[in-house]
Amino acid sequence: MATQLPSPTATTSHSGNEPRRVIRESCNNCSAQKIRCGKQRPACARCVNKKLQCNYSYSQRSGRRSSSMNTQRGGPHIAFLPGIPDTPATMPDANAMSAMYGSLTTSSPGLQGTTLSPSIETSLEYDQNPFEDPNQYHDLTFDFLASPPNTEPLHSRSTSSNTGTDMGDTAMVDSEAFWHSFPSMPPQNLDALRSVSNHPIFDQDQVASFRRSLEKTVQHGHDCMALALQVVNDLSVTREPCLVATSNPMTGIETHQMQARDVDTVLFINRDAAQSVKKILDCSCSSDQAVSLACYLATSKIVDWYGAAIEAVGERTEDFSKNAGPKTSQGIMAERIIARPIYMGKYCLDPEVQRVVRAQVVLGELKEHVQPLLNSLPRFHITGLEAESDSSANGQQACILRNQLRNVIQSARDLNGTGSS
């Protein structure tokens, strides 16, 4: 049984602001099955063949889309100008534009007393998107720019295209007063923010600079020799006195300041250096004796820093400096290390106990990171007539790095009280 409904163009009666309701072209059955309807009236061919009840409902797409800006257009204060679509059918008339501009002049003290002529009202230019200009908002906590924007007032832009307009009765807008009406943050507050954001972190900055130096060397190309020499350079400490360093006093002071590290920083830097040397030894470049020699130097510096971490003390008195003997490589490095106190909860350990803890940590680092390097490093032997004349030098050349490592391990075990190995 078919239901007689009006034609698709028929609309229901409406009064006032009630939207017009249009009958949909497809019947309910065809729309539910997503099938193209024959659109016959009063019943489509498909419903007649299948003996279905054919009904045509009202379209859900009818009516005008409600706009939030339409409700704000008649408000007393408007913070910014709404975006205007490109279609000429939706452009507001001159009276609406004049009302909107009047609300702006009443809310801004710099625009009070300004009038608009009819020719100006029809030539006003609006930005396509008001959110692109942050200076239009009145609730900003600081200015995005350091000086007023290099733009003309709204009325001057409109009058530039109309040269025949008489501006004698129109008051000029004070751009300075309009700009200063926005709130701004004092310069001292901005300086405080910059000082907080640029505050360096001591430990992380040193480790990060060391890693950047290694990454910079690798980015230049596959050069294991350059990477090994970079590790040696980063781990080296200038001996005092050094003729090259003392020739420029400022260079010596700067080097001394840059090489001050704490024990944790030494451990992190040594780990990165050991990983870099391990990569070089795994590469085919390690077959070159010059590259292997550079790896020996880098490993020797790593062992020296571990030994210096054991010798580091919290505070050095004047008597300690006077009674100290000739400075060794580890002794010079130990002076560059800051031994921070170690806490267990709220209890600070004694200085001797702190050295024992650091020695135990160093033993673990040596076993985990340095021992694999020694197993991978090739052994050098003296060849030729020199080897035949002096056989003792041959054995000394092969064991110099291992002897250095044994001394560090022995120092750590002495602090732990385990005695000799």
From Swiss-Prot:
Cellular-component GO terms for this entry:
nucleus
Matches recorded under InterPro entries: AflR, OAF3, Zn2-C6_fun-type_DNA-bd_sf, Zn2Cys6_DnaBD
GO process terms (BP): aflatoxin biosynthetic process
Tree of life domain: Eukaryota
Concerning Pfam families, the annotation shows: AflR, Zn_clus
Feature: compositional bias, Polar residues: 1-16
What is this protein's record name? Elsinochrome C biosynthesis regulatory protein elcR
